[in-house]
């Protein structure tokens, strides 16, 4: 089971270079399992034991299976994650022609570790909006091949490179795509038009706009002398999206279960499809009775907010509280913060720990050092919007927000097992 899950994750990561592609990959797997797509613009007709999903902006997705029991009776079991990861996104007018090279101007999305982006074989993917036969359409594209690179400056020309060199995102991050001769002009939108034709057989009249991100073409892999680790891009937080999906598809329950994977977590979640937007609440209100019964159902429900945790790094152990250093391959981490950067409380943490113990899954705790700031997740945002009880958890990870992150190869199976038990649980606290 562990090897199959890990390979499934690797395949999912490869299919998901952007939030758009991740949402499409999740939808494809849901439909293969019998889930029916619902359109937010249409009237919904749902049935007990039905399986459905809905997307917004092509980058956020909510999947749910309705239980045999009324949600008012037993509440809803929700798992939340996010589809986006820090990256380099192409600017609207990106063409740069300098010293005989064609480059694209980029904007840093989220809190990316920038140094690892140098000297990597990069490709480009995302969503393109275009006009065809007088109509405006959108389509996902993925060049797949390594078409760009950001070469480092040789140390001979930058003797401070190993001494805390600050990276200027405006001047040092534009990737190189090609060389050009003389006064030749390169039209990026014409390149996108050609890609639409090659990849989808679409003859676009004009490319109107796009949302495109560079990504590392190196595939994720199980690595280490004993295969102890998984290295790959976008583990934060596609790892949790995939774990939630597998738990939803394999759990057997009479209760209503929901998986929500929001976009824009890395930039604050404040969007129509982010956790700080109305998507989840609007979806639940279409499934549940209004007024008093809606509030009662939410108060009987529980959300597991799943987002990667910081594993204790052997070279930087002092960055962790000495008593709260999560280890790779030692199970999921319950994340706690007294200032509500995480939404965990004693009741929700206790219930998650109870689930882990019942499934013989190891479990750990994390709290940030008292002299350091703490990150956050969709947990507190969703809890404040819905009023739903929440526990923040995640799998220990190294190099979070790097172009290539690292997690334990045993931990995915741990997380899928406990999330499956959560979905199947008959009684919530």
UniProtKB/Swiss-Prot annotation:
GO molecular function terms attached to this record: aminopeptidase activity; metallopeptidase activity; zinc ion binding
Residues noted as binding Zn(2+) in the record, renumbered to the chain: 82, 156, 401
Superkingdom in the source lineage: Bacteria
Enzyme kind, highest EC tier: hydrolase
Signal peptide range: none
Alphabetical list of InterPro entries matching this protein: M18_aminopeptidase_2, Peptidase_M18, Peptidase_M18_dom2
Listed GO CC annotations: cytoplasm
Keyword terms, alphabetized: Aminopeptidase, Hydrolase, Metal-binding, Metalloprotease, Protease, Zinc
S-S bridge residues: none
Biological process annotations from GO: proteolysis
Record HAMAP family: Aminopeptidase_M18_2 (MF_00467)
Family: Belongs to the peptidase M18 family.
Stated name of the protein: Probable M18 family aminopeptidase 2
